[in-house]
Regions:
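Extended repeat-based scaffolds of very large eukaryotic assembly and lipid-transport proteins
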Residues: 1-109
Length: 109
């Protein structure tokens, strides 16, 4: 369940966030699937709106990264102000570092 550090979000707000996130993530995937440049992918309006949702979207980003890997690293860095991966890590290592961090912080199981 999404939460802000120390403050749980209501079930209704959680569902609203999840619905908005799913809609935006689907739009982003659809509109950017043909793009090869990550910088163009992360500059898409739907992606920027997701990052603008703030810390409450972190569990949803991590779930999405676990289930459907994509370029969510910039959104995670923007919403957490943190990067758990080493500088020279491969995309799969970055993914694993984020998922481990998410588990250690209680964002995901």
């Amino acid at each position: 369940m999404p939460y802000l550090r120390g403050t749980h979000i209501s079930r209704q707000e959680t569902e609203r966030l999840r619905s908005e996130f799913v809609t935006l993530a689907e739009q982003w995937r659809r509109d950017t699937r043909h793009l090869s440049q990550v910088t163009r992918k992360v500059a898409h309006p739907a992606y920027l709106r997701i990052t603008g949702m703030g810390e409450a979207v972190v569990p949803l980003l991590l779930e999405e990264l676990r289930e459907r890997p994509a370029h969510w690293f910039a959104a995670l860095r923007a919403t957490t102000n943190f990067d758990p991966s080493p500088a020279e890590a491969t995309p799969s290592q970055v993914r694993e570092a984020w998922l481990e961090w998410g588990r250690s912080q209680g964002y995901i199981d």
